[in-house]
């Protein structure tokens, strides 16, 4: 089938057109959006394939997608902004800011830095990820889902940690929900409002907002999300209604918030990444704060078993790969039912964002992992 492209063709970057049309076709993905920037200039913004398989509407450069965990860099920059303003310290404990006691005494030792670097003490491989544990939360609280982030954090305050805070790295969505509560408490406004004021407004990023779960509540310029297996489930948002496509209410999507709840255009994502191409001129954070964002974590979070530094590690809200002369590649990927996202800032001033309205690669694995090396290769630098 023919994969149509929308947006302006850029003669110097046609390698990306070829890559995207082939990738969308071969992977059997409905649609995708790619934006590329270089040192402060948005050079490329195109849509490929279909935003909605049912209506045949194409993806446009202005189409918004759920960005899943690419939300984390925005949450991280927001909290670092509060650190920069002196409102909170990066090594401050989070518990006093949550305003409730915790069952496990080790909670008192969890810091903001731990949450940023996924070192808080929660390991979803051991105790599961609370963002999907609707049944357990219901049995414990007797409150039916959906759950907002504050309810999920409150539930987890009553659960034991999986390891001593700071001891190691285990990817944790909960840690970012905790950071969302910290932002609201310290800033005195709700999480979304603070991110908008502190992170989005200075860059003129108007497409970003927290998305909605139900089909009827979607934005008019938002892609329609398709899962590979077209699975359905009962809606948490309308439990007595008919089964819904999985992305439209079968997950607790409106509770994802600070760890994975935003929607955006690829162009706005790449403008955000591009703001970090030169630490000295970043409109969001000072160079010393960016150094915190990129810092290698202590212990095995940043080092191999033999003590050697890892080639790549999770910093504050971004994966970090040191390249040379203090220059780094930063990136984050995201995956939820019906969408995937990848945002990359390279050390040499190039950045890109790619968004899909489906999840999972035809070959197994995920779309962001499959396309990442192809994008670096297409740039040919």
Task: Label every model-predicted segment.
Residues 52, 105-328:
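Short, surface-exposed loop or secondary-structure junction motifs
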Residues 7-67:
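Short, conserved catalytic-motif segment at the N-terminal edge
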Residues 340-346, 350-360:
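Short, well-ordered beta-strand elements
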Residues 294-304, 309, 323, 360-381:
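Short, gly/Ser/Thr-rich active-site loops of penicillin-recognizing serine hydrolases
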Residues 17-21, 34, 40, 63-92, ...:
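Active-site SXXK
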Residues 1-5:
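Acidic/histidine-rich, surface-exposed loop or edge segments in extracytoplasmic proteins
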Residues 90-105, 201-203:
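Short, glycine/proline-biased beta-turn/loop segments that scaffold the active-site neighborhood
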């Amino acid at each position: 089938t023919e994969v149509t492209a929308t947006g302006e063709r850029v003669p110097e970057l046609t390698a990306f057109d070829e890559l995207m049309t082939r990738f969308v076709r071969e992977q059997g993905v409905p649609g995708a959006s790619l934006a590329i920037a270089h040192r402060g200039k948005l050079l490329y913004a195109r849509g490929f394939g279909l935003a909605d398989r049912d209506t045949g509407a194409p993806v446009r450069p202005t189409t918004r997608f759920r960005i899943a965990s690419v939300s984390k860099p925005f949450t991280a920059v927001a909290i670092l902004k509060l650190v920069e303003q002196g409102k909170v310290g990066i090594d401050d404990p989070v518990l006093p800011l949550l305003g409730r006691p915790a069952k496990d005494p080790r909670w008192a030792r969890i810091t903001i830095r731990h949450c940023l670097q996924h070192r808080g003490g929660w390991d979803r491989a051991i105790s599961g990820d609370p963002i999907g544990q609707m049944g357990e939360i219901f049995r414990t609280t007797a409150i039916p889902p959906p759950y907002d982030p504050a309810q999920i954090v409150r539930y987890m305050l009553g659960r034991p940690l999986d390891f001593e805070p700071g001891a190691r790295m285990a990817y944790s969505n909960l840690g970012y929900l905790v950071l969302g509560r910290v932002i609201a408490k310290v800033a005195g406004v709700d999480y979304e409002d603070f991110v908008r004021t502190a992170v989005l407004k200075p860059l003129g990023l108007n497409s970003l907002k927290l998305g909605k779960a139900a089909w009827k509540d979607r934005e008019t310029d938002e892609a329609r999300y398709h899962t590979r297996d077209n699975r359905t489930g009962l809606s948490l948002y309308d439990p007595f209604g008919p089964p819904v496509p999985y992305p439209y209410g079968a997950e607790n999507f409106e509770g994802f918030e600070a760890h994975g709840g935003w929607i955006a255009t690829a162009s706005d994502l790449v403008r955000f990444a591009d703001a970090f191409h030169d630490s000295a001129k970043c409109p969001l954070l000072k160079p010393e704060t960016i150094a915190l964002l990129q810092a290698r974590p202590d212990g095995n979070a940043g080092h191999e078993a033999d003590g050697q530094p890892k080639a790549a590690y999770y910093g504050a809200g971004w994966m970090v790969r040191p390249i040379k002369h203090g220059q780094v590649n930063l990136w984050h990927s995201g995956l939820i039912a019906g969408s995937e996202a990848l945002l990359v800032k390279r050390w040499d001033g190039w950045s890109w964002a790619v968004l899909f309205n489906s999840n999972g690669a035809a070959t197994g694995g995920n779309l962001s992992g499959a396309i990442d090396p192809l994008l670096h290769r297409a740039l040919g630098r």
